[in-house]
Amino acid sequence: MPTINQLVRKGRRDKIAKVKTAALKGSPQRRGVCTRVYTTTPKKPNSALRKVARVKLTSQVEVTAYIPGEGHNLQEHSMVLVRGGRVKDLPGVRYKIIRGSLDTQGVKNRKQARSRYGAKKEKS
């Protein structure tokens, strides 16, 4: 417990909020190369095979990123764009791959929320 005099001299130190997407180094997105593409199972109440990729970013950090949407064309050495955003039922997955940019194709036959999955508007 500091004395009044110590507080006058030094003051209190502000708490620093922990950055949730440290690997992006303050950028909205980062480019990276897939080093491994695989499936993993989610936490307890859920059951599925979630598609994830291990990505080496341009910031020299290797992260695990989720591949959203149904079906994908990613394989090892694919160039991808990674954004922040965790997947609640996959521990350690704090990034998502942006569909429809670089080597990642958009989701086929997507009608709603197309911009999130890089799907072009179909001609009617």
UniProtKB/Swiss-Prot annotation:
Keywords: Methylation, Ribonucleoprotein, Ribosomal protein, RNA-binding, rRNA-binding, tRNA-binding. GO terms for cellular component: small ribosomal subunit. InterPro entries: NA-bd_OB-fold, Ribosomal_uS12, Ribosomal_uS12_bac. Residues 105-124 are annotated as: Disordered. The modification 3-methylthioaspartic acid is found at D89. It holds the Pfam family Ribosom_S12_S23. This is Small ribosomal subunit protein uS12.
